[in-house]
Swiss-Prot record:
It comes from Wolinella succinogenes (strain ATCC 29543 / DSM 1740 / CCUG 13145 / JCM 31913 / LMG 7466 / NCTC 11488 / FDC 602W) (Vibrio succinogenes). The gene is dapE. It catalyses: N-succinyl-(2S,6S)-2,6-diaminopimelate + H2O = (2S,6S)-2,6-diaminopimelate + succinate. Homodimer. Zn(2+) 1 binds at residues 66, 97, 156. This is Succinyl-diaminopimelate desuccinylase. Belongs to the peptidase M20A family. DapE subfamily. Its EC number is 3.5.1.18. GO terms for molecular function: acetylornithine deacetylase activity; metal ion binding; succinyl-diaminopimelate desuccinylase activity. The lineage of its organism: Bacteria, Pseudomonadati, Campylobacterota, Epsilonproteobacteria, Campylobacterales. One of its GO terms (biological process) is L-arginine biosynthetic process. Keywords: Amino-acid biosynthesis, Cobalt, Diaminopimelate biosynthesis, Hydrolase, Lysine biosynthesis, Metal-binding, Zinc. Pathway: Amino-acid biosynthesis; L-lysine biosynthesis via DAP pathway; LL-2,6-diaminopimelate from (S)-tetrahydrodipicolinate (succinylase route): step 3/3. Its cofactor is Zn(2+); Co(2+).
Length: 364
């Protein structure tokens, strides 16, 4: 008898799979999906697994996620790897992010006996860390084999207050920057002999801190330049600093590029000595609301939950961005995310069961 989606999740939660440890989860998953072929790619201690089954000559649809979790830390009221069940909730590190999604994908795939094309499950043990040798590497491998999926559904925890209220059809990009304003150190009593970088940047700071680089649109919030750190000087009240360093991040839409951010700052900082470094971390992407996968998942959520989901691009980055970079139409749909990475992380059993039904509807 096949285990239920809840039983699968309980088992997954007992594995202490802190990035990049896989802890034997892949063997367990393979035992649940008989009849699926396997492709395994391991690099630098990171394990990746693709299980696939060809039902017909149609499109390749992939369900994807990660089995690694962040460290639990101290202060839990339960064993973070004990999979304790209390009052309709399962507790454990990864309950929401994202072993609930993994369990739902496994359980759904185990129940499907017909599909017009190929179905696959892609799992990685490197998403919560650098994500350098995880999904991205696996997709490169699949591209070399001519086996990239046409469509992907990533079961990250996307819901905000109630399961199904939000699905992700894109993500903002992330750009990190470092700006150093160069001055000349000196005694505060002799300002004519100093060049104070604080005074140089002060009139321009309001056009950097919290500045909206675009107006946003239906799917993306404005691309905001957010200062995360400012420091300079030697903690002496009578010495002006030689340099002032500003660190910043921009979570940006498809309307604003790294080049445009760089051009804006160069224009703003004309006339003062500075050094600027811009480093893109991830690119933004948007899957069309008219794409088959967005329509399928949206309609599935509406049938199961009775409410049409909001299409969002908010939140941080996820492995969905890698699918988009390889030209795969991707959407994210998962449980409520109110306790991800938090103490006493938990997930409602009803949400996990509903997610499985959504996947079955979307793939049916």
């Amino acid at each position: 008898m096949k285990p239920s989606v809840i039983e699968i999740l309980q088992k997954l939660l007992t594995y202490p799979s802190i990035t990049p440890k896989e802890c034997g989860i892949f063997d367990y998953v393979r035992s649940l999906l008989e009849g699926f072929e396997a492709i395994e790619v391991e690099h630098e201690g990171v394990k990746n697994l693709l299980l696939y089954r060809c039902f017909g000559e149609g499109e390749h649809w992939c369900l994807a996620g990660h089995i690694d979790v962040v460290p639990p830390g101290e202060g839990w009221s339960v064993d973070p790897f004990g999979a304790e069940l209390k009052e309709g909730y399962l507790y454990g590190r990864g309950a929401q992010d994202m072993k609930s999604g993994v369990a739902a994908m496994i359980s759904a795939l185990a129940k499907i006996d017909h599909f017009p094309g190929t179905l696959s499950l892609l799992l990685t043990s490197d998403e919560e860390g650098e994500a350098k040798w995880g999904t991205q590497l696996m997709l490169e491998h699949l591209k070399e084999r001519g086996f990239l999926p046409k469509v992907a559904i990533v079961t990250e925890p996307t819901s905000e207050e109630r399961f199904g209220d939000t699905i992700k059809v894109g993500r903002r990009g992330s750009i990190n920057g470092k700006l150093i304003i160069h001055g000349k150190q000196g005694h505060v009593a002799y300002p004519s002999k100093c060049l104070n970088p604080v005074e140089l940047i002060a009139p321009r700071l309001a056009q950097i801190a919290g500045y909206n680089l675009d107006a946003g649109d239906e799917f993306f919030e404005p691309s905001k330049l957010v200062i995360t750190d400012i420091r300079g000087g030697i903690e002496a009240v009578n010495v002006t600093p030689s340099d002032l360093k500003i660190l910043f991040n921009v979570r940006h839409s498809t309307q604003t590029s790294a080049k445009e951010i760089e051009d804006y700052l160069h224009q703003l900082l004309q006339g003062i000595p500075y050094t600027l470094e811009i480093k893109p971390s991830s690119k933004p992407f948007l899957t069309s609301r008219e794409s088959v996968v967005v329509k399928r998942v949206s309609e599935a959520v509406k049938r199961v939950m009775g409410v049409a989901p909001k299409l969002s691009t908010g939140g941080g980055t996820s492995d969905a961005r890698y699918f988009a970079q390889f030209g795969v139409e991707v959407v994210e749909c998962g449980v409520v995310n109110d306790r991800i990475h938090a103490l006493d992380e938990r997930v409602a059993l009803l949400e996990v069961e509903a997610l499985e039904r959504v996947l079955l509807e979307a793939l049916g």
